């Protein structure tokens, strides 16, 4: 905790790419998820239903990067409409995050909360309530 997160490149459905460090927001929530994961769907719904997270997203203080770390893009594309349009919905081309061990994804889903400078505030989180609790205690 408190250490800089590893940067990585992500790819959007359009083919455009971006980097984690290119995301400009006070906080970034990296949500590692899979299309056919029931727990991932539950967490996505909890993020959407959270008044705190929704307000922070609306105000531009929180950016959610929903990242698919695997290689079956057919499943990812079919699932894309379920991800809120206010989020960055992306995949890891070539599964570099796993192959290069940039993040130790013990389980999916997993959330990493990062501050403006991409320092890790929470890692391997799977409870939205914990993310809310942390954000509620951070300087705005």
Feature names for model-found ranges:
Residues 1-21, 133-135:
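N-terminal "domain-start" segment that seeds a small globular fold
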Residues 113-140:
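Thiol-/selenol-based redox modules, centered on thioredoxin-like
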Residues 18-47, 63-65:
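Short active-site neighborhood of thiol/selenol oxidoreductases, capturing the structured segment around
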Residues 77-112, 116-117:
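Short, internal strand/loop/helix patches
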Residues 10-11, 88-93, 124-125:
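Short acidic-hydrophobic, aromatic-tinged amphipathic segments that line or gate anion-handling sites
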Residues 5-6, 27-28, 108-109:
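Short loop/turn microsegments at loop-to-beta-strand junctions
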Residues 9-10, 32, 113:
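Hydrophobic beta-strand positions
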Residues 41-81, 95-101:
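Structural microenvironment flanking redox-active thiols in thiol-disulfide oxidoreductases
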């Amino acid at each position: 905790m408190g250490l800089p997160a590893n940067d990585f490149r992500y790819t959007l459905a359009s083919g455009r790419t971006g980097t984690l460090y290119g995301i400009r927001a006070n906080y970034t929530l990296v949500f590692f998820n899979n299309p056919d994961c029931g727990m991932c769907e539950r967490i996505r719904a909890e993020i959407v239903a959270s008044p705190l997270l929704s307000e922070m997203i609306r105000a531009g203080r929180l950016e959610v990067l929903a990242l698919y770390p695997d290689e079956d893009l057919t499943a990812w594309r079919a699932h894309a409409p379920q991800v809120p349009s206010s989020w960055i919905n992306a995949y890891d081309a070539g599964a570099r995050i796993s192959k290069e061990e940039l993040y130790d994804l013990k389980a999916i889903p997993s959330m990493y909360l990062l501050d403006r400078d991409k320092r890790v505030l929470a890692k391997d989180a799977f409870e939205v309530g914990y993310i809310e609790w942390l954000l509620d205690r951070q300087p705005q």
